[in-house]
Curated annotation (Swiss-Prot):
This is Small acidic protein. The gene is SMAP. Residues 106-147 have a biased composition (Acidic residues). Keywords: Acetylation, Isopeptide bond, Phosphoprotein, Ubl conjugation. Belongs to the SMAP family. The modification Phosphoserine is found at S15, S17, S63, S87, S125, S145. It comes from Bos taurus (Bovine). Signal peptide: none annotated. InterPro entries: SMAP, SMAP_dom. The lineage of its organism: Eukaryota, Metazoa, Chordata, Craniata, Vertebrata.
Length: 181
């Protein structure tokens, strides 16, 4: 250690040329065995130069390469656009927004006074939705259609069922109120 101090006295600048001492950054002088091991070491340390092996394309494999025709591309794009439009229409209309919060639900008025904003559809107009969307109808919509059929046959019974429905919703609301007041 004292020999190292004598060769490099404190406070004296060293020359820019490397001495016989090997620094920690001189990896190429390390004896790692054959050239392959040396390249692996340099690659793992992040100092190795990567050899360019050619163009690598993700998914470019014989088993996965399936090229679509222009017609298939158009068909897929049209389906995606129609699905997007349907979802945006239903989101903006608020038609399928049945739950407003924990324990709260939308009250449907059949008189036409409490229509949801943006829901200007008449009941007589056909829905622009595909037949696949008919499977996703909620139970409340099915109940409404059965009530409309009953209204044509027995108007007095429908009023009673509406009153019962309102009483049920009020009864549910009593349990939802906060217990702090």
């Amino acid at each position: 250690m004292s020999a190292a101090r004598e060769s490099h006295p404190h406070g004296v600048k060293r020359s820019a040329s490397p001495d016989d001492d090997l620094g920690s950054s001189n990896w190429e002088a390390a004896d790692l065995g054959n050239e392959e091991r040396k390249q692996k070491f340099l690659r793992l340390m992040g100092a190795g130069k990567k050899e360019h092996t050619g163009r690598l394309v993700i998914g470019d494999h014989k088993s996965t390469s399936h090229f679509r025709t222009g017609e298939e591309d158009k068909k897929i794009n049209e389906e995606l656009e129609s699905q997007y439009q349907q979802s945006m229409d239903s989101k903006l209309s608020g038609r399928y927004r049945r739950h407003c919060g924990l324990g709260f639900s939308e009250v449907d008025d059949h008189d036409g006074e409490g229509d949801v904003a943006g829901d200007d559809d008449d009941d007589d107009s056909p829905d622009p939705e595909s037949p696949d969307d008919s499977e996703s109808d909620s139970e409340s919509e099915k109940e409404e259609s059965t009530e409309e059929l009953q209204a044509a046959e027995h108007p007095d019974e429908v009023e009673d069922s509406k009153n019962k429905k309102d009483a049920k919703s009020n009864y549910k609301m009593m349990f939802v109120k906060s217990s702090g007041s």
